[in-house]
């Protein structure tokens, strides 16, 4: 439904935040800050007021209601929102507002719901509905359908005002980004890791991004693809800025070509990724590593491989898509608009160096044996000091950090 009528308030429901008890104020504070960050362009056209179970975005310019809705519904931390008219608490005024809505949208059927948040109001919700419904029916040609109405009108009576609104708009849900700490996402540029980043942020964790490149074997187009993915993901955060760290892995990649058993090459490479990620996570105050690994999807993602790779990571490794099948991951990627970018034909450093027959059931002792004559510790030290570029994502801009 297009909302062409001028409304003066957007009512935002907290959803999952209502279960957070003593932490509730922290959750709502972060949500409010994230919404304000995303609405910077419209900061002079609205006022935001917080109540116990709702946020009220009061529109100083009703013409910006649709762009504000499009932004707020994609900020993690709310369950739904509604465009509302704010009116006085007398029943005649409420009925007139509802009649105006019915006359404007001209639905064949409607349903009326009443919620009395202010329990001191002299009538119950049922009594209010019994008085409002006949007034609406007398002034319009609409019919009542309580099961499948074309238009649902909700009336919410609060302490100072009444809010009359139509149709709840489902929002993205989750928890506000920033409430669950900070993690480091290993972003390959494929389909899975952007989905893993999205799901992690949906649980309230702010993230930094880590990408491994092997120039000249990986192209500048491959890096631009990763930058585009990060910008798309940043759209959901509500954070002012996020950062993408690009590690030049070429020196270590060439060292790994000296592994005696080539079938262990990907296993050892991923162990090196995790070692570097842990060092950088500590440097950037991240409490977890996040990957797009999906159990059994490729040779390096069998449970045996995951176990061998995990042993080098002191930090917990979160794998949000571990038990998703490929079609489920693709469905989410399409929903969050990362899929078409992820399938662009630019290879990452893993795909370029996959051996013909990668080991699917590696052993820790054998992995350690393959590493023992490599100069990986010295090379990682050089990488950390010299071979990392950082890009800042700020709204629609991305630029290299000086």
Language-model region placement:
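RNA-binding accessory domains that recognize and position tRNA/RNA substrates
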Residues: 2-184, 194-242, 311, 359-364, ...
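Active-site adenylate/phosphate-handling loop in enzymes that bind or generate adenylated species
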Residues: 131-136, 174-180, 253-336, 386-401
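General small-molecule cofactor/ligand-binding pocket signal
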Residues: 145, 245-247, 318
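Generic beta-strand/beta-sheet core signal
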Residues: 167, 210-212, 247-250, 291-292, ...
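Conserved G/P- and acidic residue-centered "switch" motifs that form tight phosphate/ATP-binding loops
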Residues: 190
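A conserved beta-strand->alpha-helix junction
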Residues: 230-258, 348
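Small/polar glycine-rich anion-binding or flexible loop at a beta-alpha turn
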Residues: 297, 345-353
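A short alpha-helix-loop-beta-strand transition element characteristic
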Residues: 337-345
């Amino acid at each position: 439904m297009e909302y062409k009528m001028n409304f003066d308030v957007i009512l935002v429901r907290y959803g999952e935040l209502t279960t957070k008890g003593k932490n509730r104020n922290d959750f709502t504070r972060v949500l409010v800050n994230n919404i304000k960050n995303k609405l910077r362009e419209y900061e002079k056209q609205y006022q935001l007021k917080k109540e116990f179970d709702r946020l009220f975005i009061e529109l100083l310019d009703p013409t910006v209601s649709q762009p504000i809705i499009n932004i707020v519904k994609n900020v993690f931390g709310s369950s739904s929102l509604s465009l509302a008219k704010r009116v006085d608490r007398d029943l005649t005024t409420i009925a007139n507002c509802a009649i105006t809505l019915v006359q404007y949208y001209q639905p064949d059927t409607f349903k009326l719901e009443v919620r009395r948040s202010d329990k001191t109001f002299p009538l119950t919700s049922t009594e209010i509905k019994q008085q409002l419904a006949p007034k609406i029916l007398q002034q319009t040609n609409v019919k009542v359908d309580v099961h499948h109405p074309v238009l649902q009108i909700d009336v919410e009576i609060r302490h100072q005002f009444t809010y009359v609104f139509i149709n709840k708009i489902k929002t993205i849900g989750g928890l506000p980004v920033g409430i669950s700490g900070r993690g480091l996402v290993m972003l390959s540029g494929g389909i899975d890791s952007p989905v893993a980043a999205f799901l992690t942020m949906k649980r309230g964790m702010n993230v930094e991004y880590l990408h491994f490149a092997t120039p000249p074997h990986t192209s500048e187009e491959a890096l631009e693809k990763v930058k585009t993915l990060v910008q798309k993901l940043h759209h959901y955060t509500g954070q002012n800025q996020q950062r993408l760290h690009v590690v030049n892995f070429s020196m270590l990649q060439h060292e790994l070509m000296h592994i005696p058993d080539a079938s262990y090459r990907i296993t050892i490479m991923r162990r090196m990724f995790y070692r570097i990620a842990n060092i950088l996570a500590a440097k950037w105050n991240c409490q977890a590593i996040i990957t797009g690994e999906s159990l059994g999807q490729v040779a390096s993602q069998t449970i045996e491989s995951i176990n061998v790779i995990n042993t080098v990571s002191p930090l917990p490794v979160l794998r949000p898509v571990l038990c998703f099948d490929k079609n489920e991951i693709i469905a989410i990627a399409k929903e969050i608009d990362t899929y078409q970018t992820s399938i662009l034909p630019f290879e990452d450093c893993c795909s370029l160096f996959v051996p013909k027959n990668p080991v699917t059931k590696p052993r820790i002792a054998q992995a350690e044996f393959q590493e023992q004559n490599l100069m990986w510790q010295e090379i990682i030290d050089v990488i950390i000091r010299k071979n990392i570029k950082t890009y800042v994502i700020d709204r629609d801009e991305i630029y290299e950090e000086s």
